[in-house]
Curated annotation (Swiss-Prot):
Residue numbers binding ATP: 212-219
Protein name: ATP-dependent zinc metalloprotease FtsH
Protein family: In the central section; belongs to the AAA ATPase family.
GO cellular component: plasma membrane
Cofactor notes: Binds 1 zinc ion per subunit.
């Protein structure tokens, strides 16, 4: 897509290198020439140092032609001879010779005073440090210009530019998101035919903010808009604006918008806008001045855009809550488009696109994969296909098999399996009882998600995992489902108490999940009986100040006590119910734990056959890269 740009950039960089090398060579030649000219202008003589007695001998014999007195202790003299046979000497006067001048006059020796005429080696030694210093400075200059520092061009925008017509990405390359694409087609139409809107007085939004979770395709959508409209596309990350130098961010904003105006119609796309567009606050010590200057300049530039400029500013963020309100007012990013996670049909379409360049086995059903990946983003699905391809290539296969996809699932969800990790029989039994407690509750709780797989093979920091798959895409969750989640979290804790008589440190993650859910029930979701339907979380604290530092709590100490009592009551009731179920079906719990010790990994189908449960009619044989992992038994800090 950027082949021509790269060729042009390479050509320019080569020309720059040639120019710099030519300049460096010219400077070196100039210095060498100056050295030799200095040497030859002085006569090119090379004076040989001799003892003072030798000088006296030449003088007594009348052979000294001329003498140059350098100082009171050093003279240079020339011995008579033919024009081609003169000898040049220098000597040091070891004592004060008061008769030397009169003797030179009597011998009619040409007498003068001057500075020492150094030899070529002496000249080189004197000038060499300057030459080395100049070369060192030159290379430092070249590195800062051509390398990552760019000291002398730090005020210039480093946005990636995609020329008009060379961006081949269109809406056809974006699977799903039909409502989002419909919203963005207005932008495309405006860039293609602005007079259509101007004729009736309509004003297209100056800024379009794409809001969504990471990996949902916000950047791809922005490129698709530029590709559909056939205009230039400037892409820059919000973090690229701000540097350590004061004023750099504002300068880069000005340069970016100047370039956009020169290349209109075009699109400016700022990724991760929250890196530069966070709410302006008091801060501590003024450490945010540079970022705020950059934000102010961005606001000014967007105000300076008129409809006649044919420049659209698009941005993406997954944190719209932290953006400065001035960015979101009409006239700036006044249109917000939410890019949501794909549903089952969209996931299948995304998988189809990413699998075009891979060789999938005929037994792989992309519809099944899509159904088994609720909550997965487009990036998750792309990573899933790629991991499966890597595993198949590692095994020297010609195509990707179902087992490769399953292995890729486990790797993405739980980390690399540590099959070589040494685990004692006692630790393996503890982990088996822990995971069996989680797994068994899935079959006796009405609102729990179906179990998919349970394993005691260590992966990452987890010694074992019991994870489930929702029956369908879930947009919300009710109170009964939340309570069952908490009970399943306590399944490992209760099982350890029942079968081992003591609990391990592996319950830490379970307790953390259970407590978090219970607190949200009471303080955010209005599910507490004593506190009632009230929202008790203060989310309006200044962005740059810790909440406990910036303002007091949003509720009284009396209310806080009620919240604590309510949370504790919910947790205790869930733990009791989980323990009662496991005690009632202890035989099945022990049987499942022993089978886990033996086989290490069991699927839902295998657990049902082992414990005599009815087969799951809705069972599907794949995984979710974003499945609801119920419980992860963490590392045992004891060793």
């Amino acid at each position: 897509m950027n082949g021509n740009n790269n060729m042009n950039n390479n050509g320019k960089s080569n020309n720059k290198k040639k120019n710099k090398n030519w300049i460096l060579g010219l400077v070196v030649v100039f210095l060498i020439s100056a050295i030799f000219m200095s040497y030859f202008i002085r006569g090119g003589e090379s004076y040989k140092n001799v003892p003072y007695s030798t000088f006296q001998s030449y003088l007594d014999n009348g052979l000294v032609e001329s003498v140059v007195i350098i100082d009171k202790n050093l003279i240079q003299f020339v011995v008579k001879g033919s024009n081609f046979a003169k000898s040049y000497f220098s000597t040091s006067i070891p004592y004060l010779d008061i008769n030397l001048l009169s003797e030179l006059k009597n011998k009619k020796v040409e007498l003068s005073s001057g500075k020492s005429q150094a030899s070529l080696i002496g000249v080189l030694l004197q000038t060499l440090p300057w030459i080395l210093f100049f070369i060192f400075f030159f290379f430092i200059f070249r590195q800062t210009q051509g390398g990552g520092g760019k000291v002398f061009t730090f005020g210039k925008s480093n946005a990636q530019k995609y020329e008009a017509g060379k961006n081949k990405i269109t809406f056809k390359d974006v699977a799903g998101q039909e409502e989002v694409k419909q919203e963005l087609r207005e932008v495309v139409e405006f860039l293609k035919n602005p007079k259509k809107f101007e004729k009736i007085g309509a004003k297209i939004p100056k800024g379009v903010l794409l809001v969504g979770s990471p990996g949902t395709g916000k950047t791809l959508l922005a490129k698709a808009v530029a590709g559909e409209a056939g205009v230039s596309f400037f892409h820059m990350s919000g973090s690229d604006f701000v540097e350590m130098f004061v004023g750099v961010g504002a300068s880069r904003v000005r340069d970016l918008f100047d370039n956009a105006r020169k290349n209109s119609p075009c699109i400016i796309f700022i990724d991760e806008l929250d890196a530069v567009g966070r709410s302006r606050g008091a801060g501590l010590g003024g450490g945010h001045d540079e970022r705020e200057q950059t934000l102010n300049q961005l606001l000014v530039e967007m105000d300076g855009f008129g409809t006649h400029t044919n420049v659209i500013v698009m941005a993406a963020t997954n944190r719209p809550d932290v953006l400065d309100s001035a960015l979101l007012r009409p006239g700036r990013f006044d249109r917000q488009v939410t890019v949501s996670l794909p549903d089952i049909k969209e996931r299948e379409a995304i998988l189809n696109i990413h699998s075009l360049k891979t060789k999938l086995s005929k037994d792989i059903n992309l519809q099944v994969i899509a159904r088994a990946t609720p909550g997965a983003s487009g990036a998750d699905l792309a990573n899933l296909i790629n991991e499966g391809a890597l595993i198949a290539a590692r095994n020297n296969q010609d195509e990707i098999l179902m087992k490769d996809m399953e292995e890729a699932r486990d790797k993405i969800l739980m980390g690399v399996a540590k099959k070589s990790m040494t685990i004692t029989d006692r630790q393996k039994l503890e982990t088996a009882y822990h995971e069996a407690g989680h797994a068994l509750l899935h079959y006796y709780l009405e609102h729990a998600d179906p179990l998919h797989k349970v394993t005691i093979i260590p992966r990452g920091r987890a010694l074992g995992v019991a994870f489930s798959l929702p029956r369908e895409d879930r947009l919300s969750i009710n109170k009964h489902q939340i309570l069952d989640k908490i009970k399943i979290c306590y399944g490992g804790y209760a099982s350890e108490q029942i079968n081992l008589g003591v609990t391990t440190a592996g319950v830490q993650n379970d307790l953390m999940q259970a407590t978090s859910l219970a607190k949200k029930m009471v303080t955010e979701w209005g599910m507490g009986e004593e506190v009632g339907p009230i929202f008790l979380v203060d989310d309006e604290a200044p962005i740059f100040l810790p909440k406990e530092f910036s303002k007091a709590k949003a509720y009284s100490e009396n209310t806080a006590d009620k919240v604590d009592r309510e949370v504790k009551r919910i947790l205790e009731e869930c733990l009791k119910e989980a323990s009662d179920i496991l005690l009632k079906h202890k035989d099945q719990l022990v049987k499942l734990a022993k089978e886990l010790v033996l086989k290490e990994t069991l699927t839902d189908k295998e657990v049902r056959e082992l414990l005599g449960f009815e087969a799951n009619k809705d069972e599907y044989d794949l995984f979710s890269s974003d499945s609801t992992t119920k419980e992860v038994k963490g590392e045992d800090v004891k060793g």
